[in-house]
Structures are given as structure tokens and as C-alpha cells.
Amino acid sequence: MMQDLRLILIVVGAIAIIALLLHGLWTSRKERSSLFRDRPAKRSKKEREQSPIDELDEGVGEVRVRSAHPEDEPSFGHFDAAREEPVVAPKPAPAAEPAPRAVQPAAHQTPPPLSQRPDYDDILLDNYAQEEDDEPQQPAPRREPRVDDLPPVAPAAEPAFHAEPAHQPQPEVKPAVAHEPQPAPAAIKPAKLKETVLVLHVTAHQGGVIGGEILLQSVLQAGFQFGEMGIFHRHISPAGSGPVLFSLANMVKPGSFDPEMMSDFSTPGVSMFMMVPSYGDANQNFKLMLQSAQRIADDVGGVVLDDERRMMTPQKLETYKARLREVLENNA
């Protein structure tokens, strides 16, 4: 079965190949025959287009010169002149009939240049000559003059003088009134800092708390005394006498302490604050408050933070000192 199928496929393939070859031969032969059939017409047209101009002139000459008629045919380039100024031929006519109008003989006339010669084909010239023989007195159709035949046009003469435009009165322009610049409003100066509050925080490590007993012992050793508003104050004298330099309060509201309940008390931290200006030297008072905060932090195992509750840095200390100087200068 497979052998028969293979044989059938081979036969069908061979037939298809032979059919393709025959179709290709037939198509090429058809194209070749059409090519040879169109070639003579193209060749004759090409020869007619490439024919020299001298041959056209000779054909026109043979048509114009005739022995049967004494007159010459009018030139194509001068129909207008022949129609306006007819000239009688110099040779007498053999017959008694009146002499037809004719222009000057073409033999004594200079042939027009190549640019003025009519671009007619040979066949058209022959037909035109035959019509002239049949009707010698009928004038040829008027031909439109070419650009080369027209006489040059002289340019128009420019006027000897130019007319001056009439003087128009200009409107009077009033000078603009110069506006005096108004003085700019004085810049609003910021209010001078007359007083400020310097704050330090002492907090436990990692969110822890500070016990009440150890906190009370450290605060008393730093020279604080329990006093007004239920908070501790540092006076100019460690014994608790004299003006208050700075104070210590609880970070948790209401910020007060109860000395009798310190054994059961705990807090995340305490806050120390100093009013500026204060009694005595403000710089020395701030230095004393910073030393007290560091001592309490060491006793309770905490850290010292600034007024934004960040770690105290040397740059922040310079900021505190600058605020102190500004307030002191403004109050001087």
C-alpha cells in the first residue's frame, strides 16, 4: 500500500513539474512575440523625433517653390506683415487674371532663426502645402506670436523726482509725570528676646523608670530643697536660703512630688528648668544646672536630654549659650 502511494505521489509531482515548465515556455514566447511586434513602431517614432531640423527646412522649401504659379507662398513667420502690406510679385502673370496678394519672395528673404521656425512634423507640412495649392488665395490661419517674435519692451521711465509725503502734524506728547518712589515700608524686625527658659531632662534608659527613693536621695545630695508648687528648687545657698536659681519637676503631670510617698513612687524622668535672666551670673547658673543633671543621671542610671528630648551634644550646648547671650544683650 505504501509503495503504491509513493508511486502515485512521484507521478503527480512529475506531471506538476512538466506543467510548470510548459507554462513558463509558453509565457516567455508570448512576451517575446509582443516585444518584436511593438519594436518597429517605436523605432519609426524615434527616428521621426530625431530627424534634423535641416530636413524640415528642405521640405518646406520644396512646397513653397512652384513653377506653375508665379507667386510664392507666404512665410509662416510674417503673416501679419503680409496681411497689412501686400506687395505685387516682380514677375508678370501669364494670364489676364488679377495678381493675388503675396509677400516678398522667400528666395530673397533671410530664413528665420531656429527659435522662430514652426515645430511641425513632416506629415503636417505636406498636408498644409496641398491645401495651399487648392486654395491659393485663402490666407492661412493666424498664428499666435511667440515671445521671441515680440519686440523688446522698453522699461517705463521712472519719474525724475519723488513726491514727498505731506507733512502730518505729530500729536503733542505730554511728558509723563515722574512719580516719586514711595519709601518702602520698614521691614518688621522680630521682637527682641527679653527672656527665655532653658530646659534639661533626665530619663531612664530604654523606656525604664526611676525609683522614688533613689531619686529623692540624689536630688537632696545635688542641693535641691522641696518647696513651693510641690517641686524641688536649687537656691543660691545649698541650705535652701536665697533666690532660686533653677528648679526640678516630675515629667508626668501634674509634675509635683510627695516626699512622704517617695518609697512607692516611680517616674520615667524628671525635668530641670531655669528662667533667664535670673539672679546672679546666668552662664554660671546654667553651668551649675548642667552639672546637677549629669550627677542625678549618673546616680539613677539615666541619661541627660535637651529640650527636644534628644541626646545632649556639643552643638546643642552652643545653642543654649547663644540664647543666653542674646537675652542678656537685649536686657543690658
Curated annotation (Swiss-Prot):
Pfam families: ZipA_C
Keywords: Cell cycle, Cell division, Cell inner membrane, Cell membrane, Membrane, Transmembrane, Transmembrane helix
Residue spans crossing the bilayer: 7-27
UniProt GO cellular component terms: cell division site; plasma membrane
Location of the protein in the cell: Cell inner membrane
Compositional bias (Low complexity): 98-107, 155-171
Residue span of region Disordered: 34-184
Positions on the Periplasmic side per record topology: 1-6
Biased composition (Acidic residues): 121-136
GO biological process: division septum assembly; FtsZ-dependent cytokinesis
Biased composition (Basic and acidic residues): 34-51, 61-72
Top-rank taxon: Bacteria
Classification via InterPro entries: Cell_div_ZipA, ZipA_FtsZ-bd_C, ZipA_FtsZ-bd_C_sf
Membrane disposition: Single-pass type I membrane protein
Record-stated family: Belongs to the ZipA family.
Job description of the protein: Essential cell division protein that stabilizes the FtsZ protofilaments by cross-linking them and that serves as a cytoplasmic membrane anchor for the Z ring. Also required for the recruitment to the septal ring of downstream cell division proteins.
Subunit: Interacts with FtsZ via their C-terminal domains.
Protein name (record): Cell division protein ZipA
Classification of source organism: Bacteria, Pseudomonadati, Pseudomonadota, Gammaproteobacteria, Enterobacterales
